Amino acid sequence: MEKVKLKAPILKKEVIKIFKKYGLSQDHAKISANALINAELVGAFGHGISRLKMYCDRISKKVINPKPKIKIKKISQSISHIDADNSIGFVAADIAIKKAISNAKKTGIGLVAVRNSGHYGLSGYYAEQAVKKNLVTMIYTNGPPAVAPHGAFKSLFGTNPVCFGTPSGSKIPFIFDSSISMINRGKIRFASKNNQKLPLGVALDKFGKPTIDANKALKGVQLPIAGSVSYTHLTLPTKA
């Protein structure tokens, strides 16, 4: 496979063009491109450009609505609810973090729940936006079954990423962003596309045997981080 290197601003313009061809508005295409390019720049390649085809395919299959009518409902001065109308996840997340920041600035706390959305990349990208406003931030989401309970080889839990961010007193904030699995699925997909091996102990094949083959891992299951120790964390509810 031939590798092509592009400067971030050039790549961003191309990504915007692609998203617009798939029906996104200029604004939504730019928001989505910014998130993908950020992932590349921070080294989270499994959540970067390698995901572009996935989003485009989901638009084509009508899983993602390129022209959503997003509704924001005010529950209280601090709490808001967003119905994203199956928008691309980046747009829903962008609206949500901005609303949370706005609510927090008014009352001291901002809580925002989002429904009818999809994959939005790195939670840390959004947490950092709030941290730059001097806010402590927590972001939670869930996903389809991909992780097996400790001692099993059938998926039951989502990777259910958790993210925490806080100002650090320096220019570099503290951001913790992790799925509750040994490795996120984006990294497995990236390894598969680039013929890379996985670390041992992060996934099982479909027969329940440990594998370092990314293709076999995609057909199998991911393992919970810290094994039995964090298995209990996976059982915690992530939605009401």
Regions found by a protein language model. Give the residues of each.
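Generic N-terminal amphipathic, Lys/Arg-enriched alpha-helix
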Residues: 1-22
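Short, well-structured alpha-helical segments
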Residues: 26-37
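Intrinsic-disorder/low-complexity recognition with aromatic hotspots
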Residues: 46-50
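Active-site cofactor/substrate anionic-group-binding motifs, chiefly glycine-
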Residues: 51-99
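A generic, well-ordered mixed alpha/beta core segment in the N-terminal half of proteins
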Residues: 81-167
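Phosphate/diphosphate-binding glycine-rich loops and adjacent basic-rich segments that engage nucleotide
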Residues: 147-218
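Extended, non-catalytic structural segments that build the interaction scaffolds
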Residues: 217-229
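Conserved small/polar residues in nucleotide/adenosyl-binding loops
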Residues: 232-240
